[in-house]
Each structure stands twice: as C-alpha cells, then as structure tokens.
Amino acid sequence: LLSAPMAEQPDIIDLSLPLNGTPRFSPEDVCLIAVPCFGGRAPEIALERLAQTQGGGARAILLSVYGNRSDEDTLFELKGAAMRAGYVPMAAVRAVAQHSIVPAIAAGRPDEEDARRLAQFGRVIRDRLTEPNAPPLSLAKKGLLRPFGGLPVHPRAGKPCTGCGKCASLCPVGAIPSRDPSQTLETLCITCMRCVAVCPVHARRLSPLVVKLAGRKLKKKCARRQEPELIF
C-alpha cells in the first residue's frame, strides 16, 4: 500500500527469515524498512537481521505497524538501527493493522481508509525524495525505551495439525521443530503469531482464555481508532 506509488515491482528482502548472503545497497537506492511493534519495541530479531545488511547510504523510509494501542518508540529504535547499518532515514510512517494477539482489536485493518491514506503518504514521500536538498528524518524520542521481555504465552497446535511443517519453515526464530511441528519451543518463541496466520488448517492458536483476558486488558487502551501517521 505504501510502496506502490514509489515502485511497481520492488525487490523484497524478508527480515523475518535468515538472510541468504549480505544485501548491499547504494545512495541510488530507496529502501522501505518495515517492522511490527511488539510491546512498544521493534523485534530484536528484525534489528539483528537489519544489521546484517549494508545500507551504503541508501535512503530509507521507516514503517512501524502496530495493533491500535501505540507504537511508543519503535520508530526511534528502528531509526537508530537503520543508521548504524548505513541507511539514511528520510521519512517514517506509523500504520495500524489488526492486533495479532486479540484479532477483535482493529479488526479488518488496514481498511479502505488506511489504504487511501497510505497510498497518499507514498506519493508525498516519492515527491519528497526527488527534492535535491531534502533533509533527513527528524524524529524525536517519546520517552525511555520500555523493556519488553516478551509474553509468557505461546501458540500451540491442536488436533487438526497435519504436520505439514509450514509453520516451522516460516517461524522467524526457529521455535517450531521441523520434525514435530505440533510443538513450540517456548524458550525461543516470541509470540509473533506468524504460525497462527500461515497454518493452512488453522491448527495453531493461543488459549481462548488468554485471548479473552488480553482483550479485556487492552479494550480501553485500544478503544479509540488510531490513524496512520507520516513523519519527516
């Protein structure tokens, strides 16, 4: 949605999986660096893999996606990581998607209004990047980076699991054994919920009680609709 006005067929590097080699860029390149927000922070594994790339002075647009509560200082953290990897951040976007733990929160998002605004942001960023003296991103820190130690709950596979292994092959941190994909290695799992999203038979899920309790806790904090935000 955001990149469409800037590139019809962008090259995609998936930071959710181990990198194959070292991606290298140059000042002629424009990179959209996107991460989800976990507890107000950028996922450590995403930042580690970003550090394995070589920005080479490429201009970067930063994107933080959160579940309608707050992304806190995710973008500030991502900006620092991008600069250390050799990128030059030029713009940043906060966007909302359906909450990964409690799908009833921000259900159906990004929706049509989100799509319209993100496409508009893409056009504005595209035009900005053509300006010869466009300044780099100015992004103030909201507060102290709040520690996030992960969640004490993890998805498990139920009886419908066919053992196809798709979840194991796509787990960002290798927390699902390929020989027994019905299991979850809790010491590795970051509760990103990717396994739940990709399971073809919907066998993986969190405990319904956990989802219900989390929904009660987040209901007030997430009641007001948050809108996408563009920052220069």
Whereabouts are the PLM-identified features?
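Short gly/ser/thr-rich secondary-structure transition/capping motifs
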Residues: 11-19, 178-181
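A mid-sequence, solvent-exposed acidic-amphipathic segment
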Residues: 135-172
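Iron-sulfur cluster-binding cysteine motifs and their immediate structural context
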Residues: 157, 162, 166-190, 194-211
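FMN-binding flavodoxin-like domain, especially the glycine-rich phosphate-binding loop
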Residues: 1-14, 25-150, 207-232
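Structural motif
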Residues: 19-25
